[in-house]
């Protein structure tokens, strides 16, 4: 059975255009230009010419133009304008939350379709070719991969059949990172946050050809974060920044921090547009609200004269999603680090 997608749903087009218009005025990189090219060298040894040149994204707009564009999008969508601050080094105005942009869409309204089509729009209009989709769990990763598969023909018809590779980051195939960096076609990598958030991850380990991360960051990828409220710990935010993103586009129905909010489709909006059949509110507090912290103290025990150990039950995040588990903690332990999520 062949699935058909409606390419003309206005609310989805509005969400896509919101992200695209932030970069209005950006010159399109043509087929003879590789955009950002960075020569990769490790421990003083330069790689072969083919492997050494990272064909990456490049942004030519000034901070003033980005601020102007962002405020124009927000005004169009009746949202609060982003705060502006002064960069301490350049002494120029910049967006207070940097190049993080949020799109809020009610569950079930096609969020994944929107950001996959946004990839094609950014490629079509600006020539950007390197994209990384960061997800919080394997389950969501597999869902994104399936969406890439079933929409491929649909997007090929809309966007003149661009040559595109998409794949899941596999730590056993470190050559993927070099392929991502040096390939001059549209590249989409899907990766779980826990695959690169720790120093021990293969992504961050040195090899004879350098770290896989070094290849990726040389491209200044557009990073798309699915369910960013699950990635608000300092460790996870630092991991995303380590990718050296050109920008970070954040998609969720329940943002914890909607940095530079560009578009909002609330549950009421979705109901009014007949996108959902009804809205139900069972309780002010959800029984299983995994966006909130959960800590249950099970037992306290004393070790020696002064040391106290607590046995606590928490919701911890790993590459398989949220798992409820029991951990031992002492005074001063960082629960955010232990659980992999904001507490």
Tell me what each language-model feature is.
Residues 1-343:
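RecA-like P-loop NTPase motor core of helicase/translocase proteins
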């Amino acid at each position: 059975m062949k699935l058909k997608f409606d390419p003309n749903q206005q609310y989805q087009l509005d969400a896509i255009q919101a992200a695209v218009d932030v970069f209005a005025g950006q010159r399109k990189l043509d087929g003879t230009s590789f955009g950002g090219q960075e020569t990769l060298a490790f421990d003083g040894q330069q790689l072969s010419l083919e492997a050494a040149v990272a064909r990456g994204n490049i942004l030519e707009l000034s901070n003033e133009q980005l601020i102007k564009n962002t405020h124009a999008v927000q005004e169009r969508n009746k949202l609060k304008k982003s705060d502006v601050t002064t960069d301490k080094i350049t002494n120029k105005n910049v967006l207070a939350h940097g190049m993080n942009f949020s799109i809020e869409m009610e569950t079930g309204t096609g969020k994944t379709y929107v950001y996959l089509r946004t990839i094609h729009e950014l490629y079509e209009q600006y020539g950007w070719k390197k994209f990384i989709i960061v997800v919080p769990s394997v389950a969501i990763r597999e869902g994104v991969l399936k969406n890439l598969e079933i929409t491929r023909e649909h997007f090929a018809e809309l966007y003149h059949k661009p040559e595109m590779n998409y794949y899941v980051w596999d730590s056993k195939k470190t050559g993927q990172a070099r392929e991502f960096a040096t390939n001059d076609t549209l590249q989409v990598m899907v990766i779980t946050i826990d695959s690169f958030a720790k120093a021990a991850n293969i992504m961050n380990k040195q090899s004879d050809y350098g770290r896989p991360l070094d290849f990726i960051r040389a491209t200044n990828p557009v990073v798309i974060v699915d369910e960013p409220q699950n990635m608000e710990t300092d460790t996870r935010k630092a991991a995303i920044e380590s990718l050296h993103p050109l920008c970070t586009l954040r998609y969720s129905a329940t943002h914890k921090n909607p940095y530079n909010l560009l578009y909002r489709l609330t549950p009421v909006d979705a109901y009014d547009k007949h996108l959902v059949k009804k809205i139900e509110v069972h309780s002010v507090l959800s029984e299983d609200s995994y966006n909130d912290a959960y800590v249950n103290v099970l037992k306290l025990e004393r070790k020696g004269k002064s040391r106290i150990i607590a046995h606590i039950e928490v919701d911890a995040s790993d590459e398989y999603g949220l798992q409820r588990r029991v951990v031992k903690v002492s005074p001063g332990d960082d629960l955010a680090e232990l659980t992999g999520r904001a507490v």
